């Protein structure tokens, strides 16, 4: 499975960069920052399904 290191994301303001990530919740996150914030908010229950749109 694909993994993403979110340890360097202490909830910064995310950029508008578009590099989509598909989460295990079947939602597409626009970039790593938005995905990592969602991972933190989920207490680690959200994982990466794959890179790219869901």
Curated annotation (Swiss-Prot):
GO molecular function: serine-type endopeptidase inhibitor activity
InterPro entries the UniProt entry points to: Bifunctional_prot_inhibitor (IPR051597), Kazal_dom (IPR002350), Kazal_dom_sf (IPR036058), Prot_inh_Kazal-m (IPR001239)
Disulfide cysteine pairs (residue numbers): 6-36, 14-33, 22-54
Record remark: domains: Avian ovomucoid consists of three homologous, tandem Kazal family inhibitory domains.
Location relative to the cell: Secreted
PANTHER family, per database record: OVOMUCOID-LIKE-RELATED, SERINE PEPTIDASE INHIBITOR, KAZAL TYPE 2, TANDEM DUPLICATE 1-RELATED
Organism of origin: Grus japonensis
Kazal-like domain mapped to chain residues: 4-54
Protein name: Ovomucoid
Site positions per UniProt: Reactive bond 3: 16-17
């Amino acid at each position: 499975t694909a993994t993403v290191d979110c340890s360097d994301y202490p909830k910064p303001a995310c950029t508008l960069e578009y590099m989509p990530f598909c989460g295990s919740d079947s939602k597409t996150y626009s970039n790593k920052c938005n995905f990592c914030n969602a991972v933190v908010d989920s207490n680690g229950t959200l994982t990466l399904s794959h890179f790219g749109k869901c």
